[in-house]
Amino acid sequence: MLEEILQYNKEFVESKAYEKYAASKYPNKKLAILSCMDTRLTELLPAALGLKNGDAKIIKNAGGIIADPFGSVMRSLLIAVHTLGVEHILVIGHTDC
């Protein structure tokens, strides 16, 4: 599987297919989202919210929870707010988690 991924990435870079995904590190909609890492949400969540690449900082973990007030999720949200201009935070769960 690793060889397939590396080959795809090589072709992706050589063809400059990445250019259509270019975005600022600052989220266009000043939005951060904490959600579950469930694979069913990979494309579904942004599509359901009308988000494009660069619109939001999306933080994912098992269950979409803040388990530790000093952990990596809180650190990511603090950086999003204080460094990257985020003004809105959504915590989005889902059924059948």
Annotated model-derived regions:
Residues 1-66:
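Short, conserved "active-site rim" segments that organize catalytic pockets and cofactor/ligand binding
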